[in-house]
Amino acid sequence: MDGKPATRKGPDFCSLRYGLALIMHFSNFTMITQRVSLSIAIIAMVNTTQQQGLSNASTEGPVADAFNNSSISIKEFDTKASVYQWSPETQGIIFSSINYGIILTLIPSGYLAGIFGAKKMLGAGLLISSLLTLFTPLAADFGVILVIMVRTVQGMAQGMAWTGQFTIWAKWAPPLERSKLTTIAGSGSAFGSFIILCVGGLISQALSWPFIFYIFGSTGCVCCLLWFTVIYDDPMHHPCISVREKEHILSSLAQQPSSPGRAVPIKAMVTCLPLWAIFLGFFSHFWLCTIILTYLPTYISTLLHVNIRDSGVLSSLPFIAAASCTILGGQLADFLLSRNLLRLITVRKLFSSLGLLLPSICAVALPFVASSYVITIILLILIPGTSNLCDSGFIINTLDIAPRYASFLMGISRGFGLIAGIISSTATGFLISQVGPVY
């Protein structure tokens, strides 16, 4: 793989495969904004300041007769910005419910995408997630149980859309461009987190919190149109690809080993130590990232005592750093490989180690610098930024060791990660309710 200078032919960034990476970037952008929308909106949905003035609030739905209270004006509180009395434990369950849904579909969707093609499966998952995002404000009016159900099904849809991406890259990404292409696509999640955290609070204040769901749900529907128009399962069947690019991709992929059969070698996978290292990496990575992504707006608003608008803006800063580090890490990884400066295994280990060690050090340091506004913000920026170096490490590693089963293995890997996400978000909500907001 390292000795193929021919894989550098052609105008890389003007090629169709980089166009596909941008479409996947947009789809990942869309899915993460839909996932994080609730983390922003919930600050207004369970606004404790407003709740204190509402004596007849329901535990599962909005305040039905809020307008009967003459001390609350229509401008301050209306049916478009209902307040719900959801405890920290309930919020933790709501946050983690989308992970329950994702984990249900990760493994089967990864396997089926490898057999039947990823285009339809990913597109359907994105469309379902977008429609359920539009439905979320109405679901909240019917009670917390329906919200949990909607988020669970939404997670199932996003699980379909997540894992199949590696099936496409197994057929579209030349080995020496894998880090670049996958990190361009994957950085959409970090950039989406930046956008939703930056503008979500502004939308909530200017238009009321339901519009957070309406705007990003509609964005997902637009993304679906692009997806079904531009994305194809492999370069052989794409009507717009040039002959030169098609030959470049096919010739580079022809030199890597492949398995002709569809049977999954489960026994070999179970006994493969590198795979277990990847699974453990996903578990550790998702544990920290889920806590940061889910509770960062609340942490910022309570620790730094800022309003929802400023909380969203501050919470967004770490994720622009994450998007930048993701892309730069991919460029650096492929540079090291293409110049034969480091072996493939060394590059993956290097980026995996940096992506796990550096954010952990920053997270451990946070409680000790809580009194310093500037240092706290710097550490919160560094945590997601350095964590996304993993995208050029173990996260892409399944494409290296088993490209034929990349989506199936990615489903299992994300399953380990989402188990960590479920445990961490639920445990965090429980600890907050028991210990209280000590910060």
Curated annotation (Swiss-Prot):
Glycans are attached at N47, N56, N68, N69. It catalyses: 3 Na(+)(out) + phosphate(out) = 3 Na(+)(in) + phosphate(in); urate(out) + n chloride(in) = urate(in) + n chloride(out). One of its GO terms (molecular function) is transmembrane transporter activity. GO terms for biological process: phosphate-containing compound metabolic process; sodium ion transport. Expressed in the small intestine, kidney, spleen and testis. Not detected in fetal brain, bone marrow, and mammary gland. The keyword Membrane applies. GO terms for cellular component: apical plasma membrane; membrane; plasma membrane. Belongs to the major facilitator superfamily. Sodium/anion cotransporter family. Acts as a membrane potential-dependent organic anion transporter, the transport requires a low concentration of chloride ions. Mediates chloride-dependent transport of urate. Can actively transport inorganic phosphate into cells via Na(+) cotransport. PANTHER family: SODIUM-DEPENDENT PHOSPHATE TRANSPORT PROTEIN 3, SOLUTE CARRIER FAMILY 17. This is Sodium-dependent phosphate transport protein 3. It comes from Homo sapiens (Human). The lineage of its organism: Eukaryota, Metazoa, Chordata, Craniata, Vertebrata. The gene is SLC17A2.
